């Protein structure tokens, strides 16, 4: 068999990259929705963590693994609104340039920010998507200012997938170096796997199988 034919066959058999799988998901969502909406994000950042909108006033806010919806457009009184995602350049075809926030193309494991750059860091349905969870946590800790808040929502206990390669434990937020756990909650998942709707409904966790962990943590000041 010709070498070029073998190369073509290997290309067809190679599984899609994590980035390709993520883009396929978002492209399908855009096709269904017409335009990717973001009206739900205010309650995701506030109500789902027991916070008021004013908590974010004058703060530098970073959303790690932000996706292409414009997750921080609602935070109009924030001092800075930054979404970090390795797929930012590919998201431009989905219309992110119209959003009233900044986007930075970089992985969570290598953030191009100075130490102590942010007062609020969010990782909402993203920590199990990264390549290296430990490295991502180190970077989140580094870019968070003393006294900063980390808002964490993550699915735990699921089987690894192409886009979510890590199965994380419920105890994830209990002993993170440099952070103090202020509040946490557990929820079950709806059959349609809608994470934020599951939280809105305060769906109880049944004690077995995958579930949702929310945590609000405070960065140590010394």
Model region roles, listed by residue range:
Residues 192-222:
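Core SAM-dependent methyltransferase catalytic element
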Residues 1-34:
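N-terminal, positively charged/glycine-rich alpha-helical extensions of SAM-dependent methyltransferases
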Residues 106-121:
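A short acidic, Gly/Pro-enriched loop at the edge of an enzyme's catalytic core
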Residues 120-131:
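A short SAM/SAH-binding and catalytic strip from SAM-dependent methyltransferases
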Residues 134-149:
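A short glycine-rich, Lys/Arg-flanked "PGG" loop and its adjoining helix->strand segment in the class I
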Residues 38-59:
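Conserved alpha-helix/loop element of class I SAM-dependent methyltransferases that forms part
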Residues 151-179:
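Conserved class I S-adenosyl-L-methionine
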Residues 62, 66-110:
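Class I SAM-dependent methyltransferase SAM/SAH-binding core
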């Amino acid at each position: 068999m010709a070498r070029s034919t073998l190369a073509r066959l290997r290309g067809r058999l190679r599984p899609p990259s994590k980035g390709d799988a993520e883009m396929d998901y978002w492209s399908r969502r855009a096709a269904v929705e017409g335009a990717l909406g973001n009206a739900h994000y205010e309650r995701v950042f506030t109500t789902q963590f027991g916070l008021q909108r004013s908590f974010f006033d004058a703060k530098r806010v970073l959303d790690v693994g932000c996706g292409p919806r414009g997750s921080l457009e609602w935070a109009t009184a924030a001092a800075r609104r930054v979404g970090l995602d390795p797929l930012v350049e590919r998201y431009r075809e989905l219309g992110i340039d119209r959003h009233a926030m900044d986007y930075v193309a970089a992985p969570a494991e290598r953030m191009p920010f100075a130490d102590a750059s942010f007062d609020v860091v969010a990782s909402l349905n993203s920590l199990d998507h990264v390549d290296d969870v430990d490295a991502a946590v180190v970077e989140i800790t580094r870019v968070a200012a003393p006294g900063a808040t980390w808002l964490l929502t993550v699915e735990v206990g699921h089987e690894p997938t192409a886009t979510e390669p890590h199965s994380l434990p419920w105890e994830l937020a209990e002993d993170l170096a440099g952070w103090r756990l202020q509040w946490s909650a557990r929820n079950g998942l709806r059959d349609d796997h809608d994470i934020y709707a599951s939280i809105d409904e305060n769906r109880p966790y049944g004690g077995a199988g995958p579930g949702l962990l929310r945590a609000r943590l405070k960065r140590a000041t010394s």
